[in-house]
Amino acid sequence: MAGSKKSNRREEILQALAHMLESAEGASRITTAKLAQQVGVSEAALYRHFPSKARMFEGLIEFIEEALMSRINRILDEEKDTLERIRLVLQLLLAFAERNPGLTRIMSGHALMFENERLRDRINQLFERIETQLRQILRERKLREGKSFPVEEKILAAQLLGQVEGSLNRFVRSDFKYQPTENFEEYWALLSAQIK
């Protein structure tokens, strides 16, 4: 029972941190004092659940990684057409950001500017994994469909992910007014015409 209560409090702390990142407070550095006040506990209570603020951010990064990578793997299991796989992965990344504005501040690096460098490295690694996955999807086209792209897969993958990262940054910069999935079908038509 005590373990379950501790787990619930950890989750409550992470949800409060994500909520703060989504609010106007997320545009500036979030302190443990502000977070403790948001959760309704003392700073000492926060540290009973997490040894540092960096570990709190790591908890959110782990959630982002698990959510995105598990869904990308599901897309790869269920869809075999290369362009449809790419479309679904890009749409997933944009929709996840749109549904989780506070986490988008982490994904864009904005919330990590004044935090431990290890956190920025972890987000960079996540995007490198996603780019590697995109590159692999593009490379498999030759095996699956007997077609190749006019440009090297490495360049295409970087371009596709760069488009997503630009949308995430625009979403954060606009204080979440610009929706990343807005006009996605037109956006995809433009991108797919360039890579066919």
Curated annotation (Swiss-Prot):
Keyword terms, alphabetized: Cell cycle, Cell division, Coiled coil, Cytoplasm, DNA-binding
Superkingdom of the organism of origin: Bacteria
Reported function: Required for nucleoid occlusion (NO) phenomenon, which prevents Z-ring formation and cell division over the nucleoid. Acts as a DNA-associated cell division inhibitor that binds simultaneously chromosomal DNA and FtsZ, and disrupts the assembly of FtsZ polymers. SlmA-DNA-binding sequences (SBS) are dispersed on non-Ter regions of the chromosome, preventing FtsZ polymerization at these regions.
Coiled-coil region(s): 65-142
Domain called HTH tetR-type: residue spans: 7-68
DNA-binding region (UniProt annotation): 31-50
One Pfam assignment: SlmA-like_C
Gene this protein is translated from: slmA
PROSITE patterns recorded: HTH_TETR_2
Organism: Vibrio vulnificus (strain YJ016)
Chief place where the protein resides: cytoplasm
InterPro entries membership: Homeodomain-like_sf, HTH-type_TetR-like_transc_reg, HTH_TetR, NO_SlmA, SlmA-like_C, Tet_transcr_reg_TetR-rel_C_sf
PANTHER family on file: HTH-TYPE TRANSCRIPTIONAL REGULATOR RUTR (PTHR30055), NUCLEOID OCCLUSION FACTOR SLMA (PTHR30055:SF183)
Cellular component annotations (GO), alphabetically ordered: bacterial nucleoid; cytoplasm
Subunit text: Homodimer. Interacts with FtsZ.
SUPFAM superfamilies found in the cross-reference section: Homeodomain-like (SSF46689), Tetracyclin repressor-like, C-terminal domain (SSF48498)
Gene3D superfamilies named among the record's database cross-references: Tetracycline Repressor, domain 2
Name of this chain's protein: Nucleoid occlusion factor SlmA
Cell compartments where the protein resides: Cytoplasm, Nucleoid
One Gene Ontology molecular-function label: transcription cis-regulatory region binding
Keyword Transport attributed: no
HAMAP family (alphabetical): NO_factor_SlmA
GO BP term, example: negative regulation of division septum assembly
Family, as annotated: Belongs to the nucleoid occlusion factor SlmA family.
